[in-house]
Amino acid sequence: MKRALTLFSFGAMMAFASAQVLANGNIENGKQKAATCFACHGADGNSVDPQYPRLAGQYNAYLVQVLHEYKDGQRNNAIMKGMDATLSDQDIEDIAAYFSSLPTKLDTLKGHVQGD
């Protein structure tokens, strides 16, 4: 019984923490702000081109971190640097909330992209 109560408490705590991560961004605002992302990453966040990562279903915190890294120059990509330059912290939170709320497609991407 103690074990079940402990597991239930842990599960409830994790659900609350997950909701808090999503609470920082507004999904509807993110959808509008992400319109420029659709050309490369797809309108549903599931890019069909293997050189652009799928954003749908990614962890919210990961997307926020990556967008900040592009904006701050910690990640070097000319396209993303230009796309990210004018985003505010709230824009980043909203865009991350939008893409993380979308279902991902688990089919195999066609083609192969060479790494650096």
What are these regions (language model features)?
Residues 66, 70, 83-86:
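Amphipathic alpha-helical segments that mediate coupling or scaffolding at interfaces
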Residues 10-14:
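Hydrophobic alpha-helical targeting segments used for export or membrane insertion
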Residues 8, 47, 62, 87-90:
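A broad, structure-centric signal for solvent-exposed, well-ordered loop/edge residues
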Residues 16-18:
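N-terminal signal peptide c-region/cleavage motif recognized by signal peptidases
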Residues 1-9:
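Bacterial N-terminal signal peptides that target proteins for export
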Residues 31-69:
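N-terminal targeting signals for Sec/Tat export/insertion, comprising classic cleavable signal peptides
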Residues 24-34, 43, 75-116:
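Flexible coil segments in periplasmic/lumen-exposed cytochrome c-class electron-transfer proteins
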